Design a protein with these regions (language model features):
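Short coil/turn connectors at secondary-structure junctions
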Residues: 1, 21-22, 33-37, 61-65, ...
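Flexible glycine/proline-rich, aromatic-decorated loop/lid segments
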Residues: 1-34
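Structured core elements
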Residues: 2-3, 39-41, 67-69, 76
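Active-site-proximal structural scaffolding
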Residues: 4, 17-20, 48-51, 59-62
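Acidic, glycine-rich active-site loops and adjacent beta-strand->loop/helix elements
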Residues: 5-12, 44-46, 72-75
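Glycine-rich, flexible loop/turn motifs
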Residues: 20-23, 36, 126, 168
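Active-site/ligand-binding-proximal alpha/beta "capping" segment
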Residues: 35-57
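Flexible, low-complexity linker and terminal segments
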Residues: 51-178
Length: 178
């Protein structure tokens, strides 16, 4: 899931055309429980285009929520930028369509730390019932501490796996102020 949040001044302050980054903390920390997500911020109109591509790739590859933040200035602006040439690197890795091994549960971790193998409609042995509630590897609702701990560990492993793929972002301004 990719959520794009174009922020403006608010709430109902008579400032709907003013810029504000008032949703930043809510985007980062505004959830219940241990549900990590990726939060990105676009800095230019061209960056808005590429940020959504990157966000979609992260969301699909790591099966997690990605929030892309922008502000009213970028959200209401128009600016030409060079027509991008399509790149295969924009795409998430393809979902395996071979038969799911017999007995494999929907939340069994695959070789990639913290990631689960997704099935696609029509895939042999790939039909599962999934839940958004706390669950065990078989997707049965489970409130026991062991299942909860395993879910937290799996979500943490996703972030660690993602972190290994990231490049150091550029610094704008005085690097000494960091």
């Amino acid at each position: 899931l990719v959520v794009v949040n174009v922020q403006r001044g608010g709430p109902s302050t008579g400032q709907p055309t003013k810029m504000e980054q008032g949703d930043l903390m809510t985007a980062i920390f505004g959830s219940h429980g241990d549900a990590p997500k990726v939060v990105m911020a676009a800095s230019t109109i061209e960056d808005c285009f590429y940020s959504v591509i990157t966000a979609r790739k992260i969301a699909e590859t790591f099966n997690m929520v990605v929030v892309v933040l922008s502000d009213a200035n970028l959200g209401t602006s128009q600016q030409p930028f060079p027509r991008p040439q399509f790149s295969e690197t924009w795409l998430a890795p393809p979902v395996a369509k071979s038969a799911v091994p017999e007995g494999m549960k929907p939340y069994d971790l695959d070789a990639s730390p913290g990631l689960v193998r997704r099935s696609v409609p029509g895939q042999p042995n790939g039909m599962h019932t999934l839940t958004g509630l706390a669950h065990d590897r078989a997707s049965h609702v489970a409130y026991d501490p062991e299942s909860n701990e395993e879910g937290i560990r799996a979500r943490s492993l996703k972030l660690a796996a993602l972190q290994k793929t990231l490049k150091t972002p550029p610094v704008f301004g005085d690097e000494e102020s960091l």
